[in-house]
Amino acid sequence: MQRRELSGSAVALVTPFKKDLTVDEEALRRLVNFQIENGTDIIIPCGTTGESPTLTNEEQVQVIKIVCDEARGKAQVAAGAGTNSTIHAIELAKAAEAAGASAILSVAPYYNKPSQEGFYQHYKGIANAVSVPIIIYNVPGRTGSNIAVDTIIRLAEDLGNVLAVKEASGNMSQITEMLNRRPEKLAVLSGDDPLILPVMALGGDGIISVAANQVPKTVKDLVEAMFASDLTTAQKIHNQYYNLFTLNFIESNPVPVKYTLAKMGLIEEVYRLPLVPLSSSSKAKLDAELVQLGLVEASATA
């Protein structure tokens, strides 16, 4: 299977906080090294999983700089830098590029529900403002509107640095159409861990993963198995970790993931409002899966 420039196993990295709610630089560097040691190809700070809606612009730049410093020469860094104001999104993209990001992940404008022409002009403005590659992030469940396949293809054909799309629509018909019609340069990345196998089986280029925060080597192995057309291995990994993939969304992302990472001793379990800790019932379900997979000891969930 062909490997495009932005392909493979990418992690949507969490942002660790201290108890005073400031960014925990030591823990962030630890997380980046955990990813590098386990073969992650692309590290994505300041996305949805990184709690970007509750980070200030200054904090986003701080996080991106730390990640770029720690990952330099070892993994690509595609920084989350999107918002629903085109002017602001351009400012964020420029700041991310200046901070050292090798690519930009830009979420579709949310809440204001632009037309398809509005989506096009939004991304055109961003792409023309920076020189690094752009990953379009289509996530209708969060934004309230869907970027059509025609629009994504138009953007990729017209703009030299639009090189990938993170497809988190969950719509396999739409993803299939995109894979069948895309220009050669465009990488199509699954935005949902449970869909890594089917999307890559259809010709997709990898995953921007939530679960890679917890099990980076597992996600990497699944992606590599699909690149190698080793469906037997891929199915085994997919089936073994499918429950974890889905339990990561038992409550708002990234709460289950940060809960897990705290149990693993990698971060403190701290969120910024309006995100709150898991309910007792959700903890019990997630704990059982974490113990079964050997990610934590049973004593750690007592």
UniProtKB/Swiss-Prot annotation:
<keyword id="KW-0028">Amino-acid biosynthesis</keyword>
<comment type="function">
    <text>Catalyzes the condensation of (S)-aspartate-beta-semialdehyde [(S)-ASA] and pyruvate to 4-hydroxy-tetrahydrodipicolinate (HTPA).</text>
</comment>
<comment type="subunit">
    <text>Homotetramer; dimer of dimers.</text>
</comment>
<keyword id="KW-0704">Schiff base</keyword>
<dbReference type="GO" id="GO:0019877">
    <property type="term" value="P:diaminopimelate biosynthetic process"/>
</dbReference>
<feature type="site" description="Part of a proton relay during catalysis">
    <location>
        <position position="111"/>
    </location>
</feature>
<keyword id="KW-0220">Diaminopimelate biosynthesis</keyword>
<dbReference type="GO" id="GO:0008840">
    <property type="term" value="F:4-hydroxy-tetrahydrodipicolinate synthase activity"/>
</dbReference>
<feature type="active site" description="Schiff-base intermediate with substrate">
    <location>
        <position position="166"/>
    </location>
</feature>
<keyword id="KW-0456">Lyase</keyword>
<dbReference type="InterPro" id="IPR020625">
    <property type="entry name" value="Schiff_base-form_aldolases_AS"/>
</dbReference>
<dbReference type="InterPro" id="IPR013785">
    <property type="entry name" value="Aldolase_TIM"/>
</dbReference>
<comment type="pathway">
    <text>Amino-acid biosynthesis; L-lysine biosynthesis via DAP pathway; (S)-tetrahydrodipicolinate from L-aspartate: step 3/4.</text>
</comment>
<feature type="site" description="Part of a proton relay during catalysis">
    <location>
        <position position="48"/>
    </location>
</feature>
<feature type="binding site">
    <location>
        <position position="208"/>
    </location>
    <ligand>
        <name>pyruvate</name>
    </ligand>
</feature>
<feature type="binding site">
    <location>
        <position position="49"/>
    </location>
    <ligand>
        <name>pyruvate</name>
    </ligand>
</feature>
<dbReference type="InterPro" id="IPR005263">
    <property type="entry name" value="DapA"/>
</dbReference>
<protein>
    <recommendedName>
        <fullName>4-hydroxy-tetrahydrodipicolinate synthase</fullName>
        <ecNumber>4.3.3.7</ecNumber>
    </recommendedName>
</protein>
<dbReference type="InterPro" id="IPR002220">
    <property type="entry name" value="DapA-like"/>
</dbReference>
<dbReference type="GO" id="GO:0005829">
    <property type="term" value="C:cytosol"/>
</dbReference>
<comment type="similarity">
    <text>Belongs to the DapA family.</text>
</comment>
<feature type="active site" description="Proton donor/acceptor">
    <location>
        <position position="137"/>
    </location>
</feature>
<dbReference type="Pfam" id="PF00701">
    <property type="entry name" value="DHDPS"/>
</dbReference>
<keyword id="KW-0457">Lysine biosynthesis</keyword>
<keyword id="KW-0963">Cytoplasm</keyword>
<dbReference type="GO" id="GO:0009089">
    <property type="term" value="P:lysine biosynthetic process via diaminopimelate"/>
</dbReference>
